Amino acid sequence: LQEYAHIVSHDLKSPLRSVSALATWLYDDYKDKLDENGRYNLQMMQEKVEGMDKLIEGILKYSTVNSDTLDNTDVDVNEVIHNIKEIIFIPEHVSIQVMGTLPIIQADQTKIHQLFQNFLSNAVVNIDKEVGVVEIACEESSKYWQFSIKDNGVGIPKEYHEKIFKIFQSIGNKERSTGIGLSIVKKIIDRYEGKIWLESEIGVGTTFFFTIKK
């Protein structure tokens, strides 16, 4: 799967870059001659190309989760969250809050960053309240770290509680979702002999729980 994903990625990204460049040139050269509908269609073309690019990147990441060697070091989860908040899209009405102090764990820095980034990116775009909140917390047991990520978003129907961890399964904001993020999360947690589950109420929000073995 990994080798196939890399080949497909290379073959698909080249024409995508060409389409993106052509759309940009058309917009720059003819925006004064196009009507509002024409300009809108070119912008939509760019957005669809960007969405396809994200999908390809997601497939690549999914294909490499199990093949990469885990380089376990001391990982400060507080620092990971801080770094993620600096790079992901967070709507103005949403805040990400850390409840207490998160631990320093023995894990692969890249994988833990990938894990939380997928969780948080998924959470912030599915909040429909005027004031959106995402809360991150952690509890310690003798063998595991148990993390929770709670949001006051749209909620997830019961019938999707298992499906969303499978590749290409998504609900809610389909424009921003590739259907890969939570499947990557599941594979990373599996590598740390952990479990993942959720509690959700439609219109109230969702809390994801997951464990990572010490």
Residue ranges and their predicted role:
Residues 117-118, 122-123:
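Conserved polar catalytic motif of the HATPase_c/GHKL fold
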Residues 156-168:
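Short conserved segment of the HATPase_c
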